[in-house]
Regions:
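Catalytic beta-strand/loop cores that center a nucleophilic Ser/Cys/Thr
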Residues: 150-222
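A glycine-rich, often tryptophan-bearing local segment used as a flexible ligand/cofactor-contacting loop or short
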Residues: 101-171
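Boundary at the C-terminal end of the N-terminal hydrophobic targeting segment
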Residues: 28-30
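Helical hinge/lid and interdomain linker segments adjacent to catalytic or ligand-binding clefts
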Residues: 40-130
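N-terminal secretory signal peptides that target proteins for export/translocation
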Residues: 1-11
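Bacterial N-terminal signal peptides
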Residues: 13-25
């Protein structure tokens, strides 16, 4: 004769509680480890138009910032990196002086989905001279390049910080003077929140007038987006104040501000 043994309700309850505790502990451990993992940033430097000699200096500076601020940089010029399985590895995609058409239609769609689902974007300088026929990107970067002064193209100008509470500006002087190639912009996205205005009476060649944005952010497309117009020169990436500006922009994009 066989005897069936019913489970004691107390022991069943205790077993379930212990199992739940262990599973919860594993989940918490995984979350804690993920939180400790350095943020991953993809720095995209593909150019099909003008190529800035400052790109390499910019990549080097961003990697150095990563060592200080706790993020890792992967630099690529391969548009095939814009695949859903690859994009999901990164918390931020940064366009460093990219120019003209850099992604095909499928890659554009993958990037749109990445941003719509909360991925972050940051653009430096000629990121505004990129993908003129892609409306989503135009809104994402915030404005397109229209022109810049010539002979010389690099000029010293004064900027005015409009929002000193943002991570990208909180350590900047309210009146900031530096040398760079100052872009004039067109198709400015009305959703951008301007952080810094370029004072056109401080240099020659400005065409945007009294409202000449040079750094801004927005969150109108799903994820965080930040752009700064500086970074034409190699010297830019050796300036402590400009690097602090970039560091703050990255912190904002990563949500670590």
């Amino acid at each position: 004769m066989t005897h069936s043994r019913s489970l004691n309700p107390f022991w069943l309850f205790k077993t379930l509680v212990l199992t739940g505790f262990l599973l919860g502990s594993v989940g918490a451990f995984a979350k804690e480890n993920n939180a400790l993992d350095p943020a991953q940033i993809m720095v995209f430097t593909k150019t099909t138009g003008w190529r800035h000699s400052s790109i390499e200096a910019g990549v080097k500076a961003l990697k150095t910032l990563g060592e200080k601020d706790g993020f890792e940089v992967t630099q690529t010029e391969d548009a095939f990196s814009f695949h859903p399985d690859n994009l999901k590895k990164y918390q931020l995609v940064l366009f460093l002086s990219t120019t003209l058409e850099v992604l095909n239609e499928n890659q554009q769609k993958a990037f749109e989905n990445y941003i719509s689902n909360g991925g972050a974007f940051m653009g430096i300088h000629a990121a505004a001279d990129t993908e003129y026929e892609w409306p989503f990107y135009g809104k994402l970067v915030g404005a397109y390049f229209e022109s810049h002064p010539n002979d010389p193209n690099v000029l010293t100008a004064q900027m005015r910080v409009l929002d000193s509470k943002h991570p990208a500006t909180k350590n900047l002087p309210l009146s900031w003077t530096r040398a760079d190639e100052w872009y004039n912009y067109k198709n400015i996205n009305p959703d951008i929140k301007v952080l810094i205005n370029l004072e056109e009476d401080s240099y020659s060649g400005g065409t945007n007038g009294a409202n000449h944005p040079i750094a801004w952010y927005h969150e109108s497309l799903g994820g965080r987006a930040f752009y700064t117009g500086g970074g034409h020169t190699e010297a830019s990436f050796e300036e402590a104040t400009f690097l602090d500006h970039l560091s703050g922009g990255i912190a904002y994009c990563l949500g670590s501000d």
